[in-house]
Amino acid sequence: MARVTVQDAVEKIGNRFDLVLVAARRARQLQTGGKDPLVAEENDKVTVIALREVEEGLINGKILDVRERQEQQEQEAAEMQAVSAIAESRR
């Protein structure tokens, strides 16, 4: 298990407050969102995995925003398609 130094992750994000927000969002995605880790799990907790992803430059706030927007657009498109199918079946 590689040790994560917060200082390395802070340098990637810019400041420790944004690091906390980004790492928490990513850890929540890993825990509940069914997302796959971008680094080897190595029996680490999701918070450590999130910090390692940040440290390696694989995750940052902009990347998370883009991915969430894409997923939201895909979900909205699927919902609109389902609504259209229901409307067509009632005609």
Swiss-Prot record:
Q: Which SMART domains match?
A: RNA_pol_Rpb6
| Disulfide bridge map | none
A single GO molecular function term of this UniProt record: DNA-directed RNA polymerase activity
- GO cellular component, as recorded: DNA-directed RNA polymerase complex
What EC number(s) would the UniProt record show? 2.7.7.6
Which SUPFAM superfamilies does this UniProt record tie to the protein? RPB6/omega subunit-like
Leader sequence range is none
Q: Which GO terms describe its biological process?
A: DNA-templated transcription
What reaction gets catalysed by this protein? RNA(n) + a ribonucleoside 5'-triphosphate = RNA(n+1) + diphosphate
> What domain of life is recorded for the organism?
Bacteria
Record field: transmembrane: none
Keywords recorded for this protein, A-Z: DNA-directed RNA polymerase, Nucleotidyltransferase, Transcription, Transferase
Catalytic class of the enzyme: transferase
What protein family does this chain belong to? Belongs to the RNA polymerase subunit omega family.
Write down the PANTHER family for this protein, in alphabetical order.
DNA-DIRECTED RNA POLYMERASE SUBUNIT OMEGA
Q: Briefly state the protein's biological role.
A: Promotes RNA polymerase assembly. Latches the N- and C-terminal regions of the beta' subunit thereby facilitating its interaction with the beta and alpha subunits.
Q: How does it assemble?
A: The RNAP catalytic core consists of 2 alpha, 1 beta, 1 beta' and 1 omega subunit. When a sigma factor is associated with the core the holoenzyme is formed, which can initiate transcription.
Q: What is this protein called?
A: DNA-directed RNA polymerase subunit omega
Q: What is the lineage of its organism?
A: Bacteria, Pseudomonadati, Pseudomonadota, Gammaproteobacteria, Enterobacterales
Gene assigned in the entry: rpoZ
